[in-house]
A protein has these predicted regions:
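Hydrophobic pocket/interface hotspot
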Residues: 15, 42, 46, 112
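The catalytic Nudix box helix
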Residues: 26-64
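A conserved beta-turn-beta hairpin within the catalytic core of GNAT-like acetyltransferases
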Residues: 20-23
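NUDIX/MutT-family hydrolases
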Residues: 89-133
């Protein structure tokens, strides 16, 4: 799961991983159970990682109906079952009416910043995250 959080000005929220300083990303995560609907996963991960409730007035969650399959980085391989080497990432976005300060879980993320989407794409460590940010103008609800 990848959720790009942005404003109408196409400023994007990035959060820095606590376990990998310098690794900036959008909200990411996985289903809690096999049948969990993707939209529910996106909403839960946003709440867990930023404190933002997607149901707040003015917030717009959108499924891009786009997915990426990529090889799992070795540093995170231990989080997966033995033999699992690839992950399928479903892309969503969440438009906020304005840039807000997230409430980070310090076990997962240590810092946050808002950047224009092109600068944010350059800052992301994940190629699929950077690609999603570059697609933001096509998928954004303005």
């Amino acid at each position: 799961m990848l959720v790009v959080i942005y404003t109408p000005a196409l400023d994007v929220l990035l959060i820095e991983r606590s376990d990998q300083p310098g690794f900036w990303q959008s909200v990411t995560g996985s289903k809690d159970f096999l049948d969990e609907p993707l939209a529910d996963t996106a909403q839960r991960e946003v709440l867990e990682e930023t404190g933002f409730d997607c149901a707040q007035p003015g917030f717009i969650l959108r499924d891009w109906h786009l997915s990426n399959r990529y090889e799992i980085y070795p540093v995170w391989q231990k989080r997966y079952c033995p033999g699992v080497t690839h992950n399928t990432e479903h892309v969503f976005s969440l438009r906020l009416p304005t840039a807000l300060a997230p409430q980070l879980n310090p076990r997962e993320h240590s810092a946050w910043l808002w950047l224009p989407y092109l600068q944010a794409a350059d800052r992301c460590f994940s190629p699929s995250n950077a690609e999603a940010l570059l697609l933001l103008p096509q998928f954004a609800v303005l």
